[in-house]
């Protein structure tokens, strides 16, 4: 009981102290912590503190904090929180292709899960269920494709192209696949390769 009280007191006063610090000092501490893979919980805590003081940060810093917080959430098995923070990062820096790539892979996991449901419903020969599961699958694929397209336009690789091709084919979107090169060409003109915070 005493240990719990002491821990709660430490966390409360520690949080109060961080909130009283100059924002530059808190941001520097965050930058240091996020480099240490063994301090994920501390990184989450200080990143949330920074986001609570978002009016004191510039847009580049907000993009950076959200991006790295999303990465920590993805690494610690919280994909929904990761998606939310990657999307928040895109609001501040919409052309950073690494964020698009990360979101693409998080959504791809959902596509894979929904794709299995489509396959299972087809095996059951349940037409209504198959239509329902395919509709949900297609919605998720349609969310996923733009992230991979931006990533592929900015940093082309065979794996991403194969994923895109597979997603288009799995939803029988031949027109989307045929016009993919045109979209990639248009998207590659605006790529951010480094998430700067200054």
Q: What is each model feature region?
A:
Residues 37, 71-77, 104, 109-119, ...:
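Short coil/turn linking the two alpha-helices of tandem helical-hairpin repeats
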Residues 65, 99, 160-161:
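TPR alpha-solenoid repeat register
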Residues 62, 96, 157-158, 191:
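Residue-level recognition of tetratricopeptide repeat
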Residues 18-63, 198:
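N-terminal leader/linker segments that initiate helical-solenoid repeat arrays
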Residues 108-147:
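Short coil/linker segments at helix-helix boundaries
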């Amino acid at each position: 009981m005493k240990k719990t009280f002491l821990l709660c007191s430490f966390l409360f006063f520690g949080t109060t102290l961080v909130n009283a610090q100059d924002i530059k000092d808190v941001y520097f501490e965050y930058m240091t912590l996020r480099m240490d893979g063994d301090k994920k919980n501390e990184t989450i805590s200080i990143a949330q503190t920074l986001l609570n003081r978002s009016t004191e940060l510039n847009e580049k810093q907000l993009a950076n904090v959200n991006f790295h917080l999303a990465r920590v959430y993805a690494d610690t098995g919280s994909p929904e929180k990761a998606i939310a923070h990657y999307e928040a990062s895109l609001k501040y820096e919409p052309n950073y292709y690494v964020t698009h790539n990360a979101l693409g892979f998080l959504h791809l996991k959902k596509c894979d899960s929904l794709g299995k449901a489509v396959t299972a419903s087809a095996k059951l020969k349940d037409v209504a269920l198959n239509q329902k599961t395919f509709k949900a699958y297609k919605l998720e694929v349609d969310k996923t494709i733009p992230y991979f397209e931006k990533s592929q336009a900015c940093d082309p690789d065979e794996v991403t192209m194969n994923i895109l091709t597979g997603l288009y084919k799995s939803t029988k979107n031949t027109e989307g696949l045929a016009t993919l090169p045109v979209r990639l060409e248009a998207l590659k003109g605006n790529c951010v390769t480094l998430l700067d915070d200054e």
